[in-house]
């Protein structure tokens, strides 16, 4: 399997990437795109099914674009993810490595996400089976997921296996009410229509947040919209936060928009080891709560804290890792690009009465400088959890200048992690590697690496 989750076929030295098939399948392929060194294709006929193939459990498999590895048993999924980490670190990093620990699989392989966002559209995607029936469909409104490569088309989702079933019941109830009362769904090209997005967040504390996003251009639409909100509140009394956002822009970003409370609170909480983390409608929080806890425990274990260390937490986000390790450190300093995330980090520190954590907002390469190190002290430990692109060269240079005893590198992209490890290799030796599966049925894998000063 390739890193993008596609299977690989070879014809006369031409490498062909094929989605929705598994090693051992015998298929006819149709080339969809050809480059100099590789091609992309799709399977048009199956002659023989692989003995390792699993039966997809989701009725939307192969259309919605998510959970592409349902056709692999979970044991095979994590085997390929383990191999992906090993291949990236060895082929890209080209550094000396210890034995890589077996990947930590997810206890939950279904209903493991705590957040899903659904899109409304008046252009429902018709599946191949529906098109072949040559029937005119009266109801072309849909709420579900975007179709890959067709931004204005949405696949109507009946059941998604990623979030607790309350999510399915809420989405389907909203859809049916909107159908019955003739609410307009947004046209993603012309931006006409009322209903835009539906976000559902659950938490380990049992709280439930629902955010409905709409476009309101006339007074009577607001009254209609509030009737929908009241229907949701009456139908699902377990909702602890029913919120709405009016978005009259031409895009779906909500960071610059006000959030209004229709019922309940404007936030909910996640809990780990007695710590409470406030999660608002715009807050980032790892979407697999149980596996995030395991990931953070690994990072803390690798950090080897005794209570005397100054810890820098780079790309701290909402400060979850920083606050999580603070009780084992002398002081923690978190740095993050997004100001709103830093405000969340400070709030979470205050909620948990954490006095030894400081947080700073700014671009990492501009914030983490030699002057910053000289002012705040040389860290004993650096924990870094960068975005998929990895760390900027300037950030790597300052880490090398700071010379912490240990670096804990948490990555959602082992390829860029491997590149960065190579840049650190002159001064640091990799001591431990622990892959973690946060997203079953996808090709994505997290990896935690411990480096120690040579």
From Swiss-Prot:
Lineage top rank: taxon: Bacteria
Q: Which UniProt keywords apply?
A: 4Fe-4S, Iron, Iron-sulfur, Metal-binding, Methyltransferase, S-adenosyl-L-methionine, Transferase
| Any one GO molecular function term | rRNA (uridine-C5-)-methyltransferase activity
Metal-binding recorded as keyword: yes
One biological-process term from Gene Ontology? Answer: rRNA base methylation
Name the Pfam families on file: TRAM (PF01938), tRNA_U5-meth_tr (PF05958)
Q: Where does S-adenosyl-L-methionine bind?
A: 286, 315, 336, 385
Which residues are listed as membrane-spanning?
none
Q: Which InterPro entries match?
A: MeTrfase_TrmA_AS, MeTrfase_TrmA_CS, NA-bd_OB-fold, SAM-dependent_MTases_sf, TRAM_dom, U5_MeTrfase_fam
E.C. numbers? 2.1.1.-
Query: What residues sit in the active site?
Result: 412 (nucleophile)
Q: Which residues bind [4Fe-4S] cluster per the record?
A: 58, 64, 67, 160
Give the signal sequence positions. Answer: none
* Keyword NAD tagged: no
**What family is this protein classified in?**
Belongs to the class I-like SAM-binding methyltransferase superfamily. RNA M5U methyltransferase family.
Q: Which named protein is this?
A: Uncharacterized RNA methyltransferase BT_0643
Its organism's taxonomic lineage begins at: Bacteria, Pseudomonadati, Bacteroidota, Bacteroidia, Bacteroidales
